[in-house]
Amino acid sequence: MVPEAELEQTNAGLVPASAGWFVLNARDARWFHRPGRDSLPLTGCDEFEAETYFRMLGMSLQVLSPGEPNSMYHWETEQEDFLVLFGEALLIVEGQERPLRRWDFVHCPPETRHVFVGAGDGPCVIVAASSRQFQKDGPWGYYTVDEAARRYNACSEEETQDSDVAYAHVPPSQPSRYREGLLPD
């Protein structure tokens, strides 16, 4: 029998504190905020939760303001999949720009270079899922330089595997509580 995980109340919201199954409402969970972008790593962040990090699957909610990227242009060694739940976004994939709207699904096989940028006149909500099966065997991927991504401040200044280098020009995300109105009703 699989036990229920303990949820720990932190200053920024609830986080899983042990292994096991759990139910967690996104509005009660700990988010990470930086200007223009909020994210909820539903399955843990390896740099923050070594004990409860999900080793096989990564999943997050990302809320983007218009013009704000969800990450820096990159590729990963694992498959990644995305679903636009609300609003509009611009996908930059392999140097091409593709507009996205609610319910658009994006599949990125391993090594697909990509980034999302909020679009339209309001926030965009994206659910992101990725395999983590092979990341233990070597590098997770790479931040790459791309002219289309650069136009949206969505790429590193240089090719690198170092996230500190890739994100040097943006403020770091900080743990935060859910902000009212962030998610649609």
Where are these regions (language model features)?
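Short, conserved beta-strand element in jelly-roll/cupin
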Residues: 56, 61-66, 74-92, 130-131
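Short acidic-glycine-tyrosine-enriched beta hairpin
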Residues: 81, 95-111
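Ligand-binding loop in jelly-roll beta-barrel domains
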Residues: 90, 110-137
